[in-house]
C-alpha cells in the first residue's frame, strides 16, 4: 500500500514539474523581446526614408517574427539577418497582418519586394541568394517609393 502511494506521489510530482515547464516555455515564447534599431532607406527618388526595425537574428526570433501580431505601426518593420547569402523562404502561418517583404543583398541593395497574405502556408521565396529580409506593413514600400535597387543602411 505504501509503495502504491509513493508511486502515485512520484507521478503527480513529475506531472506538476512537466506542467510548470510547459507553462514557462509558452510564456517565454510570448514574451520574446526584439532589439530595435533606427535605419534608413534611400528610395527611388533619392529621398531618405526612416524606418524603425526589430532585429531577428536567432532561430527563435526568426521563427517568431510577426506571428500573432494584430497591429504593426507604419514606419516600422522587422529585419531578418542571416549569416550568409542564401535563397530565403518565408510564410505567414499564424500571422494575421498583411505584410510586404524586401529581399536585400549583403551590400544593402533591395533585390525584390513581394506582398504576403495573412495566415498563408504558401512560401514566398527570394529569386536569388540574399543576406537580409525586411518585413513591413503591406503597401509601405509602394507608399514610400521603395523598390528594386533602393539601398538600406544596415546595422
For the regions a language model picked out, list residue spans one by one:
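Compact, glycine-rich, soluble single-domain proteins
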Residues: 30-155
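Bacterial N-terminal signal peptides that target proteins for export
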Residues: 3-16
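Bacterial N-terminal signal peptides
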Residues: 13-26
Amino acid at each position: 500500500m505504501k509503495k502504491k502511494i509513493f508511486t502515485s506521489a512520484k507521478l503527480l510530482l513529475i506531472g506538476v514539474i512537466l506542467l510548470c515547464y510547459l507553462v514557462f516555455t509558452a510564456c517565454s515564447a510570448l514574451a520574446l523581446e526584439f532589439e530595435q534599431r533606427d535605419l534608413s532607406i534611400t528610395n527611388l527618388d533619392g529621398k531618405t526614408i526612416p524606418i524603425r526595425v526589430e532585429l531577428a537574428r536567432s532561430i527563435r526570433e526568426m521563427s517568431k517574427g510577426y506571428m500573432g501580431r494584430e497591429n504593426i505601426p507604419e514606419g516600422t518593420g522587422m529585419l531578418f539577418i542571416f549569416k550568409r547569402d542564401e535563397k530565403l523562404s518565408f510564410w505567414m502561418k499564424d500571422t494575421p497582418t498583411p505584410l510586404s517583404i524586401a529581399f536585400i543583398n549583403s551590400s544593402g541593395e533591395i533585390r525584390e519586394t513581394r506582398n504576403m497574405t495573412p495566415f498563408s502556408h504558401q512560401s514566398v521565396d527570394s529569386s536569388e541568394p540574399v543576406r537580409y529580409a525586411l518585413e513591413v506593413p503591406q503597401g509601405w514600400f509602394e507608399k514610400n517609393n521603395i523598390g528594386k535597387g533602393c539601398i538600406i543602411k544596415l546595422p
